[in-house]
């Protein structure tokens, strides 16, 4: 019933926007997307040398998005999953002002949420980022507005939201600029409590044929404030000379209280914190040379106390562990603009990491649960070269090749990463683009440590895997942009050594083992269509539809080799209703059909959200009321029924209602912010 309601709500405003002229519905595709529909409209997107550039102020007009993170979700093909953004259903790198983001998903979300939409200029979307960007794969580069005047500007925001428990927060931003000097600062705090329930149904079969029903219910109360802060300064001694220095920090104090009932009866408490500090300096010259250094320190100490009664006995222990990271990155890059539409670029980067992690137990636990504090070191060296060539305004080519050497105690390897983007503009407003790219992804540092943590009251063991290898991926994509408005994308991706954390009911012990493993490969092919429709000045709607084929194979998955494939669909509808000059409403819905991950089946899920935004003082004061997951259909219940493996997990989902108040002074236009990569650090 909830699914039916979700689909009806998603289609409501779309139906209104689509009911324009019957002749438009019966014509061919090219005629049903006529020029008359865009007459008098300023193009939202245009093509530039292998990328699509979206005019964000125009795209976000009357939208309820009030920060950069929400703004990115308005781009065609962009969706949100587990707190991170995807482009066409696959991972995408994010940049600010053309500088690679090195921040983890959670840190990047916190940063983007501090940037108001009034500071956004445009977003450059690339299906295949050239090597000069020092990232690989899909990329969204977010450019911010800049002011040349001497200014003192800022913004303050208060917000609160209610799910099962309440959360609250505040943030402040400030920019000062005078002459050749500029400085900016921001601070954000998130507080409150969170509550969720997880129900596990586990039918566990051992070697002796005995069957054990290990069902349990886990209730978690989580609390702890999170503080994000940044100080930065720029010095511009002459035109096109810029020396930048920035300090970014994040501190999160965490406390989780768990109670478990069922086949396992347990009480557990987690106490700890995460601290990240980053210092970055870079210099840009007028002759297109850029160089810099980046240093990151990260620590995540944690203490867990567990008292548990299992069918196999009792666990009563205290564990202490910590991850401490020191990482340096040095980089330099050079570009040359040549005659005849040619340009040349090349560069080098060196990243060194020292991971000093340890773990120790006190109490009734086996000795193999301990991890000595042996440093783990790795070095990544990357060199690249590339060129671009334009033939008039209609045809452009961007070709580059990067060579990367990864070295650690486990293995050492060189790997090439070619990249190609070919773009053709057959006529005004029409773009055809073909891209080929490759990438390598690395597991988080804690995943490769020989450490063991307990979950589910001791029935679950989270085990590290020192033999985990990086994955290699290859992507081929094609894009068709019609009338600078309608977007169609096709892609194929092959990933060798695809790694994912999965669980396995051990046949020799009554234990559910969680471990990161490499699959043989992961393959995916898909189609995406994005169609916007407007009805007068009061309704703007867009529909994005995806069709995806996915295949995963692993010939040595414990004693259960598998080869599984699925075809699934995703649908997303966004509607903006202009009620008055100062009052707008947004109604968004999404739905995904059944999918898979390894031997898991992922049931269908959906989300319905709404927002009402009032601006009593335009450009100064904004009040926003919003609701997310209104039908409580966003959480899924993954399950596996494969040979001897039978398990189902259901996580609670609560609708969220929130209210925010934002005050801006000085027509604030924030300067660029750097990001810090903590994606491979241990997160609790």
Predicted ranges, named:
Residues 158-164, 178, 189-193, 249-253, ...:
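Transmembrane beta-strands of outer-membrane beta-barrel pores
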Residues 68-71, 108-110, 125, 135-157, ...:
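N-terminal periplasmic accessory domains that precede
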Residues 101-127:
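Short acidic/polar hinge/loop motifs at secondary-structure boundaries
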Residues 440-490, 494-496, 514-526, 534, ...:
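Outer-membrane beta-barrel signature, preferentially recognizing the C-terminal barrel domain
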Residues 181, 226-252, 267-415, 419-429, ...:
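Face-selective signature of the C-terminal outer-membrane beta-barrel domain
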Residues 21-60, 80-82, 89, 124, ...:
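Short, acidic, small-residue-rich periplasmic hinge/interaction motif at the N-terminus
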Residues 520-592:
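Gram-negative outer-membrane beta-barrel transporters
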Residues 564-684:
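Conserved C-terminal beta-signal and adjacent last beta-strands/turns
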């Amino acid at each position: 019933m909830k699914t039916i309601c979700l689909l009806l709500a998603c289609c409501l405003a779309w139906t209104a926007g689509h009911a324009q002229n019957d002749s438009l519905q019966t014509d061919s595709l090219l005629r049903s997307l006529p020029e008359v529909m865009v007459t008098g409209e300023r193009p939202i997107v245009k093509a530039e040398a292998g990328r699509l550039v979206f005019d964000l102020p125009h795209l976000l007009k009357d939208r309820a998005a009030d920060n950069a993170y929400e703004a990115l979700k308005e781009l065609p093909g962009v969706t949100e999953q587990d707190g991170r953004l995807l482009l066409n259903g696959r991972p995408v790198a994010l940049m600010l002002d053309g500088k690679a983001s090195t921040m983890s998903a959670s840190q990047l979300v916190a940063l983007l949420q501090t940037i108001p939409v009034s500071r956004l200029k445009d977003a450059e979307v690339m299906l295949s980022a050239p090597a000069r960007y020092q990232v690989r794969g899909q990329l969204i580069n977010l450019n911010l507005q800049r002011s040349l005047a001497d200014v003192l500007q800022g913004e303050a925001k208060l917000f609160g939201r209610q799910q099962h428990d309440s959360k609250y927060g505040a943030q402040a931003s400030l920019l000062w600029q005078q002459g050749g000097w500029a400085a900016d600062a921001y601070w954000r705090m998130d507080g409150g409590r969170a509550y969720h329930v997880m129900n596990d149904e586990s039918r566990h079969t051992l070697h002796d044929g005995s069957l054990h029903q290990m069902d349990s219910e886990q209730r978690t109360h989580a609390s702890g404030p999170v503080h994000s802060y940044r100080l930065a300064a720029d010095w511009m001694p002459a035109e096109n000379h810029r020396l930048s220095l920035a300090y970014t920090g994040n501190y999160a104090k965490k406390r989780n209280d768990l109670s478990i009932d069922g086949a396992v009866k347990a009480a557990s408490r987690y106490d700890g914190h995460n601290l990240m500090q980053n210092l970055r300096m870079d210099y840009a010259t007028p002759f297109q040379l850029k160089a810099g250094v980046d240093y990151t320190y990260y620590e995540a100490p944690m203490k867990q106390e567990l008292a548990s009664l299992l069918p196999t006995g009792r666990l009563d222990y205290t564990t202490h562990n910590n991850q401490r990271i020191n990482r340096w990155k040095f980089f330099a890059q050079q570009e040359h603009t040549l005659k005849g539409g040619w340009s040349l670029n090349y560069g080098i980067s060196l990243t060194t990491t020292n991971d000093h992690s340890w773990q120790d137990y006190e109490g009734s636990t086996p000795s193999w649960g301990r991890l000595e504090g042996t440093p783990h070191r790795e070095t990544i060296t990357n060199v690249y070269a590339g060129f671009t060539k334009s033939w008039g305004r209609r045809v452009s080519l961007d070709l580059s090749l990067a060579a990367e050497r990864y070295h650690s105690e486990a293995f050492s390897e060189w790997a090439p990463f070619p990249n190609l983007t070919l773009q053709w503009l057959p006529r005004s407003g029409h773009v055809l683009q073909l891209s080929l790219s490759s990438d390598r992804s690395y597991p988080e540092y804690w995943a490769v440590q020989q450490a063991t943590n307990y979950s589910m009251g001791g029935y679950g063991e989270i085990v590290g895997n020192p033999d985990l290898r990086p994955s290699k991926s290859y992507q081929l994509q094609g894009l068709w942009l019609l009338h600078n408005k309608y977007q169609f994308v096709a892609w194929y991706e092959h990933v060798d050594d695809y790694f994912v954390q999965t669980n396995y009911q051990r046949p020799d012990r009554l234990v559910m083992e969680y471990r990161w493993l490499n699959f043989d490969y992961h393959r995916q092919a898909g189609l995406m269509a994005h169609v916007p429709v407007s009805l007068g000045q009061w309704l703007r709607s867009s529909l994005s539809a995806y069709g995806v084929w996915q295949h995963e194979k692993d010939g040595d998955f414990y004693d259960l080799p598998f080869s599984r494939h699925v075809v699934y669909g995703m649908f997303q509808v966004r509607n903006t209703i202009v009620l008055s000059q100062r009052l707008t409403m947004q109604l968004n819905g999404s739905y995904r059909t059944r999918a898979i991950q390894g031997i898991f089946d992922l049931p269908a899920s959906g989300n319905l959200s709404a927002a009402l935004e009032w601006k009593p003082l335009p450009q100064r004061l904004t009040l926003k009321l919003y609701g997310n997951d209104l039908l409580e259909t966003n959480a899924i219940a993954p399950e596996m029924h494969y040979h001897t493996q039978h398990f189902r997990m259901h996580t609670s989902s609560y609708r969220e209602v929130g209210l925010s108040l934002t005050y801006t002074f000085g027509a604030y236009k924030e300067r660029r912010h750097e990001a810090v990569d903590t994606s491979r650090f241990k997160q609790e």
